[in-house]
Amino acid sequence: MREILHIQGGQCGNQIGAKFWEVVCDEHGIDPTGRYTGNSDLQLERVNVYYNEASCGRFVPRAVLMDLEPGTMDSVRTGPYGQIFRPDNFVFGQSGAGNNWAKGHYTEGAELIDSVLDVVRKEAENCDCLQGFQVCHSLGGGTGSGMGTLLISKIREEYPDRMMLTFSVFPSPKVSDTVVEPYNATLSVHQLVENADECMVLDNEALYDICFRTLKLTTPSFGDLNHLISATMSGVTCCLRFPGQLNSDLRKLAVNLIPFPRLHFFMVGFAPLTSRGSQQYRALTVPELTQQMWDAKNMMCAADPRHGRYLTASAMFRGKMSTKEVDEQMINVQNKNSSYFVEWIPNNVKSSVCDIPPRGLSMASTFIGNSTSIQEMFRRVSEQFTAMFRRKAFLHWYTGEGMDEMEFTEAESNMNDLVSEYQQYQDATADEEEYEDEEEVQADDM
């Protein structure tokens, strides 16, 4: 079986992760003690992707939980599904990273990283054929960003041929938690560009907007936001866990979505987004799902896909529906909005269909798009970064942990390179591509 090892780090990562396990347990009919109480063989058929079966018939998540302070871990442990995790897989320090990337990456985090890697190794050895890792973290804090990227680079060294998927919560434009978020995020992106295979970009503000506008929640809590994220996370891997007509896995996803290795930051969306009360009154159709899924208001990060072009996209449908109809709808979207797709990648929308819908819905879909408009997010963070960095504001917190200003300069230029790469492919046309090839050929002849 193609197992996925789940790692959650920092306060944000642990809260998203806890919500995600609630959703996955529910889909597989596993109760908070790890016993199976479901009613369908399909739930058990590939339960191994995310669970290890213990000797007494209990299912234990393949999850590693880490943090540099015990607080969030305690609340996960006392939460609804706290008892299902393997107690040894909680790895935590006492000091906290204090929203300081350098503490997470170089000092406090570096002291804890070996015990985390031990647990990761143990879990990986329990796998039959490990497909890859999924990491939940935020990029604005200290632990999720600093220690999270440290762990990603260590895992990359040890398991170079396994997929590395991250769910990364970027700092929001208007909702700021700490003043040094731009520093932490830029230093993290510098790592993610090099070491991760696929990054699903999330952002609190976009999630707030969805809750507020679409779900009509007047005061959304982090619980509501995390619920949206976990629905998407579950959708990304549903093809691995349930039988379907068109399957996809992490590697197929990467092959279909990443035209150039550095451009692996995706926007995600989920449909149907209906408020909790009104769900049961509406039957959904594939066209409605498709329309909502491609809607800019549905994107879970603060970038507008209408300001850029899609290099590639992937749509994962769940529920009983005709594959033919799905294909027709996808072609339809591409024909109607052809200006929003780059013309030099033909057939750049992949779709997959999984037969089992999420709890409480007849059908649902998850959208993953590789759009050049994601550069808006990087641009925004970069501007905030530069505003502080050119005055060397708050730098002593980082240099005091042994960092060098050079690292900041490198991270900044790497992020700006990323932005210009996205811009370059946004502006590229098919004719230019041919022209460049001819030039290269002439150069080779000389």
UniProtKB/Swiss-Prot annotation:
GO cellular component: cytoplasm; microtubule
Listed transmembrane segments: none
Record's compositionally biased regions (Acidic residues): 429-446
InterPro entries, sorted: Beta-tubulin_BS, Beta_tubulin, Tub_FtsZ_C, Tubulin, Tubulin/FtsZ-like_C, Tubulin/FtsZ_2-layer-sand-dom, Tubulin/FtsZ_GTPase_sf, Tubulin_C
Presence of the UniProt keyword Metal-binding in the record: yes
Keywords of this entry: Cytoplasm, Cytoskeleton, GTP-binding, Magnesium, Metal-binding, Microtubule, Nucleotide-binding
Region described as Disordered: spans on this chain: 426-446
Gene Ontology biological process: microtubule cytoskeleton organization; mitotic cell cycle
UniProt entry tagged with the keyword GTP-binding: yes
Superkingdom of this protein's organism: Eukaryota
Main localization, broad class: cytoplasm
Binding of Mg(2+), residues: E69
UniProt subcellular location: Cytoplasm, Cytoskeleton
One example GO MF annotation: GTP binding
Positions bound to GTP: Q11, E69, S138, G142, T143, G144, N204, N226
Cofactor: Mg(2+)
Binding partners and assembly: Dimer of alpha and beta chains. A typical microtubule is a hollow water-filled tube with an outer diameter of 25 nm and an inner diameter of 15 nM. Alpha-beta heterodimers associate head-to-tail to form protofilaments running lengthwise along the microtubule wall with the beta-tubulin subunit facing the microtubule plus end conferring a structural polarity. Microtubules usually have 13 protofilaments but different protofilament numbers can be found in some organisms and specialized cells.
Role description: Tubulin is the major constituent of microtubules, a cylinder consisting of laterally associated linear protofilaments composed of alpha- and beta-tubulin heterodimers. Microtubules grow by the addition of GTP-tubulin dimers to the microtubule end, where a stabilizing cap forms. Below the cap, tubulin dimers are in GDP-bound state, owing to GTPase activity of alpha-tubulin.
Family affiliation: Belongs to the tubulin family.
Name of the protein in question: Tubulin beta-6 chain
Annotated source species: Zea mays
